[in-house]
Amino acid sequence: MAYPFQLGLQDASSPIMEELMNFHDHTLMIVFLISSLVLYLMALMLSTKLIHTSTMDAQEVETIWTILPAIILIMIALPSLRILYMMDEINNPILTVKTMGHQWYWSYEYTDYEDLCFDSYMIPTNELKPGELRLLEVDNRIVLPMELPIRMLISSEDVLHSWAVPSLGLKTDAIPGRLNQATITSNRPGVFYGQCSEICGSNHSFMPIVLEMIPLKLFENWSMSMT
């Protein structure tokens, strides 16, 4: 989860988020090098007194500044496309959870189990226990098994919402009348926090998401107790 005054990304807890962080660093390095080169050339132009008035064309230079940006764009596009396909790909999910957005709460249905569904509301500030996080705790957490592929089917009952958990690299729009898909695979157990990331009305800020990732055996015990 995020901390006060944090400048970087949240710690990665899924393969997708690890790839996204690597891509962020890769792209940032390219942007830094280009910016440094441009600033250096601007400083050079402002500080030098030399001029070249007789140059009418420079085909070699034009070739370089056409090919070089194309190579840079390819260096950015290839890893981006790889991550895009990784996010869309899902092979033999062990579990499917249907997520519905409402004003202003989430509802979850474990489609592989009978009668395993519940609503998830934010816990009001005056009902929080010591150590709980304001505006982030819910009365019913989503409990999922770790290290296994899980499919999330996401939609909405009313207006546009967005189901997002940053540390897992997830952000999927919940659109009325449309079913979107996302994949979750957590590398480790833990509790992961997210929020609705689409302005959806006056209580948009009060739609937290809490995922609890646990070992498969504990998940089986939890699902039996819930049904």
From Swiss-Prot:
GO molecular function, one term: copper ion binding
Positions in the Mitochondrial matrix compartment: 46-59
Mitochondrial intermembrane side: 1-14, 88-227
List of residues binding Mg(2+): 198
EC top class, as a word: translocase
Subcellular location per the Swiss-Prot or TrEMBL entry: Mitochondrion inner membrane
Catalytic activity reported: 4 Fe(II)-[cytochrome c] + O2 + 8 H(+)(in) = 4 Fe(III)-[cytochrome c] + 2 H2O + 4 H(+)(out)
Main location (coarse class): mitochondrion
Cofactors that this protein relies on: Cu cation
Domain of life: Eukaryota
List of residues binding Cu cation A2: 196, 198, 200, 204
GO biological process: ATP synthesis coupled electron transport
Chain positions recorded as Cu cation A1 binding sites: 161, 196, 200, 207
Quaternary structure and partners: Component of the cytochrome c oxidase (complex IV, CIV), a multisubunit enzyme composed of 14 subunits. The complex is composed of a catalytic core of 3 subunits MT-CO1, MT-CO2 and MT-CO3, encoded in the mitochondrial DNA, and 11 supernumerary subunits COX4I, COX5A, COX5B, COX6A, COX6B, COX6C, COX7A, COX7B, COX7C, COX8 and NDUFA4, which are encoded in the nuclear genome.
Family: Belongs to the cytochrome c oxidase subunit 2 family.
PANTHER family, alphabetized: CYTOCHROME C OXIDASE SUBUNIT 2 (PTHR22888:SF9), CYTOCHROME C OXIDASE, SUBUNIT II (PTHR22888)
UniProt function note: Component of the cytochrome c oxidase, the last enzyme in the mitochondrial electron transport chain which drives oxidative phosphorylation. The respiratory chain contains 3 multisubunit complexes succinate dehydrogenase (complex II, CII), ubiquinol-cytochrome c oxidoreductase (cytochrome b-c1 complex, complex III, CIII) and cytochrome c oxidase (complex IV, CIV), that cooperate to transfer electrons derived from NADH and succinate to molecular oxygen, creating an electrochemical gradient over the inner membrane that drives transmembrane transport and the ATP synthase.
The protein's name: Cytochrome c oxidase subunit 2
Organism: Gerbillus gerbillus
